[in-house]
Structure formats: structure tokens, C-alpha cells
């Protein structure tokens, strides 16, 4: 490992990544028993789908298909984080008014939510072969809704939760609202109609 770090310093590193990042990635790679992975190799992997030719689906048709899938499910994996801290929480959701809504008693996801509004959530089917892939990744902004505000009470009504019952709880239920910024959709079935299996919706 020392030889590889020395090589980075002598040769001036690879690509444009800061020296500290390259050294950190070298240590991580060696400690995990893997080969030496450069910044450029990480970037190439990250950009894999960006560089693929895309045959876009008509936006309205895509949105209709995505909405049907979202409404046919009720559980997502919600990723939150701040600094080196990350959390991924399975949580029930509802979707209305173009946003995702989640009631939560609490938990460590709020460590990230306090300091970082940027979140990601995923809805997906279990793997059943490459021809049956179906998933949505949502990048969005999270807000906490004020307890017993009009917005809070409206969602409680949609969930058929009596507001008076909620008011009797020792601590109010937290209501998380996620506004989508981008949805990355992967449906194998799109290929049957001549479209790319991966589609993107920007909001």
C-alpha cells in the first residue's frame, strides 16, 4: 500500500482528483483486497448510463406509467444522510399532489433530515430476471410538515387517521414530505415498445 501511495505522489496522481481523495481511495481499495481504482475509473463507472444512447419515451406516457407504478406500491427505501452519516429506512408512503408523504414516529433518519434536505428514495420489485426489472429512484428535497397544520391534517385525512386521535399521542407523529427533483426509471418492458429501459423525468 505504501508503494502505491508513493507512486501517486511521485507521478502527480491520475486525472484531476485531489491528492487526498486518491490516497483515500487507494487505502480503501487495498484494505478491501481489491485492485487499484483511480478517480477516472470511478468516474467512468458513475457515468456509464449517461454515455448510453437513450431512446426517450413520450413524457406524458412515461409519467402515466410511473404514476401507476407508484400508486400500486406503498413502501419505499428512504436514504438520508449528513457528512459521513448515512441511513436507509424502509417506510410506508403515500403519493399525492406530486409529492411523497410519510408518517414516522421517529428514528435515526432524522439525524440526516435535520442537516440535509437532499434525500433519495427507491421503489422496486424483487429481482425476477433481467427481462422483468422494475424500479424507480427518486432524488428529492425533504421537508417536515408542522404537526396539525392544514397540510398535516389533510394528509391525515387521506390516510384515514383521525386528527383527534393523533393529538392524544404523547409525541406528535412526524410527517415527512419529499418533493421530487428527478426520477430515474428502469422498466425492462419499455424495450418491447422500442424505448430504452432506463428513462428520466426531471421536475
Q: Model segments located where?
A:
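Charged, gly/pro-rich active-site loop segments
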Residues: 9, 27-31, 35-58, 134-203
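Short, basic/aromatic recognition patches
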Residues: 58-69, 73-75
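Short beta-strand segments
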Residues: 73-106, 121-125, 134-136
Amino acid at each position: 500500500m505504501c508503494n502505491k501511495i508513493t507512486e501517486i505522489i511521485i507521478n502527480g496522481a491520475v486525472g484531476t482528483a485531489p491528492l487526498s481523495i486518491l490516497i483515500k481511495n487507494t487505502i480503501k481499495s487495498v484494505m478491501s483486497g481489491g485492485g487499484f481504482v483511480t478517480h477516472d475509473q470511478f468516474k467512468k463507472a458513475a457515468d456509464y448510463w449517461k454515455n448510453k444512447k437513450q431512446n426517450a419515451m413520450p413524457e406524458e406516457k412515461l409519467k402515466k406509467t410511473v404514476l401507476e407504478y407508484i400508486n400500486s406500491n406503498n413502501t419505499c427505501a428512504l436514504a438520508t444522510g449528513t457528512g459521513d452519516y448515512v441511513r436507509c429506512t424502509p417506510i410506508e408512503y403515500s403519493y399525492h399532489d406530486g409529492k411523497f408523504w410519510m408518517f414516522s414516529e421517529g428514528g435515526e433518519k432524522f439525524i440526516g433530515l435535520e442537516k440535509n434536505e437532499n434525500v433519495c428514495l427507491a421503489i422496486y420489485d424483487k429481482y425476477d430476471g433481467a427481462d422483468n426489472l422494475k424500479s424507480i429512484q427518486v432524488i428529492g428535497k425533504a421537508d417536515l410538515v408542522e404537526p396539525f397544520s392544514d397540510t398535516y391534517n389533510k394528509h391525515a385525512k387521506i390516510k384515514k387517521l383521525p386528527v383527534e386521535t393523533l393529538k392524544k399521542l404523547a409525541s406528535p407523529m412526524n410527517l415527512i414530505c419529499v418533493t421530487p427533483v428527478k426520477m430515474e426509471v428502469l422498466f425492462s418492458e419499455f424495450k418491447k415498445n422500442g424505448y430504452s429501459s432506463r428513462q428520466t423525468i426531471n421536475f
